[in-house]
Every structure is written in C-alpha cells, then in structure tokens.
UniProtKB/Swiss-Prot annotation:
Superkingdom as given in the UniProt entry: Bacteria
Record CDD domains: DnaB_C (cd00984)
Reactions catalysed according to its record: Couples ATP hydrolysis with the unwinding of duplex DNA at the replication fork by translocating in the 5'-3' direction. This creates two antiparallel DNA single strands (ssDNA). The leading ssDNA polymer is the template for DNA polymerase III holoenzyme which synthesizes a continuous strand; ATP + H2O = ADP + phosphate + H(+)
Name of this chain's protein: Replicative DNA helicase DnaB
Domain SF4 helicase: 196-463
Database matches in PROSITE patterns: SF4_HELICASE (PS51199)
Keyword rRNA processing attached: no
Length: 465
C-alpha cells in the first residue's frame, strides 16, 4: 500500500528534480554566431532571417544580439569597440560580462563559414524550449481551469502548439530573387503546355462552363459558396466534392456541421445514382433504383476516398487538426469542404461575433495554404437582400462579410429565379454568380438544377445574362 504522505513527499522530490533540469540550448552556437557577426557585419541579414533575440538562451547573449540590431538600424558598424561603447552608455556592459567577454567572443571565432548552421542550432533549441514552456502552460491550465470547459482548454492547447509550428517554418519565407521565381513559373507553364487538360489547372469541378471561368478549384485557395436558404448551396458544394472524389484518388474531406453523416450519404447516393432522394429517404425504391444505387455503392466502396465528419460546433483548431490527420494518413487531400462556416465556434471570441468569424476565416485560409488544397466554406447571406427588387447576391450580402470577402480567393453565389417567381421562364436553371476571383474573371454561368436528384448538372439550354 502506498501511503499519502509518501506520495506527497515523492511528488515534491520529483518536482524539485524537474526544476533542476536545464532547458536544451547551445552556448557554443550562440557564442559563435555573436562572434561571427562582429567579424563580418554582412552576415547579419542572413542570420536575422533564422534567429531573433528571444531565441538565445543566455540573457547576456540576448542583450548583445539586441544591441547589435540597434547599432545596425542606426547605420553603425558592429565591432568590439562600437558594441562595448554602446552597451556601456546604456549601463548594460556589466550585465553581458564586460569588455573582456566581448573580446573573448571575437577572439574565439576564427571565421563565419558555418554561421548559418550555428544559427539553425540556436533556432532548433529555442523551438524545443518553447515546446516545453507551452506544455507546462497547458498542464497548469489543466490544474487551474479558471472555470473553462474542456473544449476551451483543448482549443487553447491546440492553438498554442500550432503557433510554435507556424514559427518553425519562418525561415522558409521571405524575398526570393526574380530568377528563382521566374524559373519556377516557366517550369509550371511548360507542364501546362505539355498537358493542357482543357485549360483546367486546378481540381476539375465537373462543370464545363465553371471550369472555363475558374480553370478549376486551385490549391491553397479559400472558396466561399453562399446563398439564401433553399437555393441549393449544400447540394452544389456536395456535387463539387462528389465530382472531385470520382475524378481523383486523394480523399475529399467533408465537415458537415449542419447535417448528420447519414443524410449527407443519402444525398450523395441520390446524386450519383440519379435516384429520387425522396424515395431514398422513405425507402420506397423500385428494382431500377436499387440497381442504380448498387452500382454507386460499389464505386464508393472501391475508391473509399470520402471522409465525413458530422461533429457539431467545431472550432477552427479542431477542423485544422482533423484535416491534418486525414492529410497525413492518406499522404494528401484533394478537397476540403465545411458546411457551414457560421456554425463553427471560437470559445475565446464568443462575445464578439465579428472577431469570431474573422478568426474562422483566417484559419480556413491558413489551412488551405498549409495543405496546398482548395478549402470550400459555405456561408449564409444577410436577409436584407430579400428587400431588393433584384435578389441576385453581391459580395456585401455575405453575413459578417468583411473578413470573408477579404480572405476568400473565390466567392460564388447561387441564384435560382424560380424561388422568387413562380412562373419564371428559368425553372430548373441555377445561376452561379462569381462575385470575386482573385486570379480570374468574375461573371455568371448557368447550371441545370435537378433538385429531386440533389444535383446540379451542366447547362445545355440557351445562354442568357
């Protein structure tokens, strides 16, 4: 039997041991970088892209690095004399080990040949230390919840860890010479020339006219699909996912915050099988229906490349972590769809809906860029458009539109005239209005709406504006 007093003492002992652990660092690498910068000031621009002052473990080294930066910002050179003089004027020379330590740094660094490698060592150690710090903060948050629910704590933990991951790849960003960019661009153009693919450079939408306007759904893009209720925004987004799943091998990931997975699957079977969805929902199927559905089921089971997550009220961090997992397990994704954006939640921003939507929008855009896949997010529209005579949506009709309009690369609205005009000449016709396209034209294309199949198809009727 383990007695409470022993356990308490043992815990206290372990706590003291943990406190004695020294976080990972490399004083030698830090000294080599600082000494190298005194030898060759021109190395500063390269080094500063890899490390910042806070990456240095030693406080004196942090102070020295900061002083170097300030001297260079003022246009002064960095050497033993200028650095020691500047530190002395600010009363910091004693804190960094006096003139003798600066002289030692300079003396013990014979060259700057490996200065970037040393900077990388400093950065790596700093990231690991930050991981330890964040892990401790997460543990403390678990012990002292301050009234926060587990969902909020998980969101805090995930976002804290993700911030470290974002910093990890900082050195990969920054200016590139036009020669490098031009070489990459010409290579891309050559690939397109050799495999034109009817002008589709992204994910084929399955709709000819939409492909002509967009060249497909492009990697890294945030795509907003918006419409008033009953226009078919979920159906349209699902059709894009279905078409992508049939045309490509990599998985399609669907986050359905509004409908359960079973309803999504019924719609998918109706669409792909061309079977009336009302008969599927009620089970009133004939032999032909079963035959059509059996063929579809066999194809879906053979490909097995559609994932549906019907969890409700997901946070951006949850969406991101789950998408990453599916991406990692399948070595890639074709497309991600979120239905719909306004049902997502950010617990820490729940008191400010505008900031909450802005964070959701920013995270989805970041996810698209990180995984290099198109992310489709469905959105509601403001009711105010119902007061207009022309009820075709425009960008400003997006609910909480500011951040959505800014972050989106492609915005598509759905308008069906028959919803507002019972005797419309355009029954069964849907207008897909491209309100924004960062790298292409805006305008309108038409699709045929087959609601009984939960499906949009290519439009073969007369064109109209």
């Amino acid at each position: 039997m383990v007695y409470p007093i022993y356990m308490a003492k043992n815990k206290s002992y372990l706590h003291q041991i943990n406190r004695l652990k020294i976080p990972p660092h490399s004083l030698e690498a830090e000294q080599s970088v600082l000494g190298g910068l005194m030898l060759d000031n021109e190395q500063w621009d390269s080094v500063s892209e890899h490390v910042v002052a806070d990456d240095f473990f030693s406080k004196p080294h942090r102070l020295i690095f900061q002083e170097m930066q300030q001297l260079l910002d003022l246009g002064h050179p960095i050497d033993l004399i200028t650095l020691s003089e500047s530190l002395e004027q600010k009363g910091k020379l004693e804190s960094v080990g006096r003139f003798s330590y600066l002289a030692e740094l300079s003396k013990n660094t014979p060259s700057t040949a490996n200065i970037i490698a040393y900077a990388d060592i400093i950065r790596e150690r700093a990231i690991v230390r930050e991981m330890i710090l964040v892990a401790n903060k997460i543990a403390n948050a678990g012990y002292d919840t301050q009234g926060r629910k587990s969902e909020e704590l998980l969101d805090y933990a995930e976002s804290s860890v993700f911030k470290i991951a974002e910093k990890r790849f900082k050195k990969d960003s920054g200016p590139k010479n036009i020669e490098q960019i031009l070489d990459e661009t010409v290579t891309s153009i050559e690939k397109l020339f050799l495999s034109p693919n009817d002008g589709v450079t992204g994910i084929n939408t399955g709709y000819q006219d939409l492909n002509k306007k967009t060249s497909g759904l492009q990697p890294s893009e945030l795509i907003i699909i918006a419409a008033r209720p009953s226009m078919g925004k979920t159906t349209f987004a699902m059709n894009l996912c279905e078409n992508a799943a049939m045309l490509y091998d990599k998985p399609v990931l669907i986050f359905s915050l509004e409908m359960p997975g079973e309803q999504i699957m019924m719609r998918m079977l109706a669409s792909l099988s061309r079977v009336n969805q009302a008969r599927i929902r009620t089970g009133q199927l004939n032999d032909e229906d079963w035959s059509r559905m059996s063929g579809t089921i066999n194809v879906l089971l053979k490909k097995k490349n559609i994932y549906i997550d019907d969890s409700s009220a997901l946070t951006p961090s949850e969406v991101r972590s789950r998408a990453r997992r599916i991406y990692r397990e399948n070595k890639g994704l074709t497309l991600i769809m979120v239905d719909y954006l306004q049902l997502m939640r950010v617990p820490s921003l729940s008191d400010n809906r505008t900031l909450e939507i802005a964070e959701i929008s920013r995270t989805l855009k970041a996810l698209a860029k990180e995984l290099q896949v198109p992310v489709i997010a469905l959105s509601q529209l403001n009711r105010s458009l119902e007061q207009r005579s022309d009820k075709r949506p425009v960008n400003s009709d997006l609910r909480e539109s500011g951040s959505l309009e800014q972050d989106a690369d492609l915005i598509m609205f759905i308008y069906r005239d028959e919803i507002y005009h019972e005797n419309s000449d355009f029954k069964g016709v849907a207008e897909i209005i491209i309100g924004k396209q960062r790298n292409g034209p805006i305008g309108t294309i038409c699709l045929t709406f087959n609601g009984h199949w939960s499906r949009f198809d290519n439009y073969c009727g007369p064109k109209y504006d």
